[in-house]
Amino acid sequence: MLESEVFDICYNINELILNSQMDTARTEVIKLLDRLNREGKEYSPMVNHFIREVGLFPYIDKNTASWQEQAVFEAYKTDLGGGEQKTLHSAQSRVLKRLLAGDNIALSAPTSFGKSFIIDAFISIRKPDNVVIIVPTIALADETRRRIEHKFSGMYKIITTTDATLRERNILILPQERSFAYVGKFESIDMLIVDEFYKASSSFDDSRSTSLLSAMIELGKIAKQKYYLAPNIHNIKENVFTKGMQFMRFTDFKTVITMAGKVYEKMGILSLIHISEPTRLRCIS
């Protein structure tokens, strides 16, 4: 990739930013970085500048960035627990700031957004006594447990079953059916986290909605703070389970892109197959 090509692409990205098309500009930056990575090229200071402009701070290359971009990379670095530190992107940082301020947040963002980083950072910084995390499946509960246990088992009792004895500080990671076992066992919960909260609506998941809605209402009564997550919700109508919560929507904040490709049969060209190829530059979530 010639320097002149990089310059032309960066010029177009700058035009998009000037015309308030930030989401499109971010997509073009990701495409540029993917191409540079595949060709084994370094990020120039100009490329690092536009990484910063679109808020993808974790992608900044400290080896080639100017001191301004290096400062941003360090400024957004956050403790995620267990000695792990990560640089958050701009949208993650906005959500974490609101949570640390005590706000109740309903967040809609794509899977690649890195919502789990925000949870870990909140626990590491705020150090709440009791956290309840409701997840859609037992498999996801186990996956979340492994992550949380690795970082916080020295400070908290990590609970995934219905018959555990509570300690002074607890993190419960449960499907909604199991969460009922702890209704009435807490005087208060410092943080209630619900993944895929939109499934409390019967229009999305009739089989899960009743038990999830009941769990959200009962545990929500004693929760000092709530953080609800969903992948692609564009708005929230007035309802009982998100009453009083602030809706933050980042459905267009992409940290990866999906490129459609076409695969033709060599013989006869009889079929056309559409494939989806996610392009991921570095691990965000």
Task: Annotate each predicted stretch with a short phrase.
Residues 1-276, 280-285:
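N-terminal helicase ATP-binding lobe
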